[in-house]
A protein has these predicted regions:
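Non-Sec secretion/translocation targeting segments of pathogen effectors
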Residues: 134-136
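Long amphipathic N-terminal alpha/beta scaffold segment
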Residues: 1-31
């Protein structure tokens, strides 16, 4: 399962890291990238960097995963804001955000598995904000 895969990659790290995984139309991982700032409390990735990543790799979908090296896998307010911002960036680029997984000292947290991903997808979707298609 994907949570076990990212846990094996992120749990051993001493600093917080974010990984983005490009998913193709057949729901297979095609590419992954790790972002890290060497900080135990946060990793900062600018929206422009994620936009470039999406434009370069053109995935059908995306899974985000990051770790809390010294704390439980409980999403913080900053994690919720990041997930909402990432969903909006994905929506603007016609990419489906499948999940955001947090790896902590007590296991993993999946926005998808607890049912929050669909709510975030609906709330932070460009079509919902502007009322559908843009027509001249």
């Amino acid at each position: 399962d994907f949570s076990e895969f990212v846990s094996a990659r992120l749990a051993p790290l001493d600093c917080e890291a974010l990984e983005l995984f490009c998913i193709d139309a057949n729901e297979r991982i095609r590419f992954g990238k790790r972002f890290s700032a060497g900080d135990t409390q946060r990793v900062r990735v600018e929206p422009e960097e994620i936009s470039r990543f999406l434009a370069t790799h053109r995935p059908a979908g995306l899974v985000a995963a990051h770790n809390h090296p010294d704390s439980p896998a409980v999403p913080s307010d900053a994690d919720d804001r990041f997930t909402a911002q990432l969903q909006m960036l994905c929506s603007l680029n016609n990419v489906r955000l499948y999940d955001h997984i947090i790896v902590g000292t007590d296991g993993t947290y999946s926005y998808f598995l607890v049912g929050r991903m669909e709510e975030i997808r609906r709330a932070f979707n460009v079509n919902n904000l502007i009322g559908g298609r843009i027509c001249p």
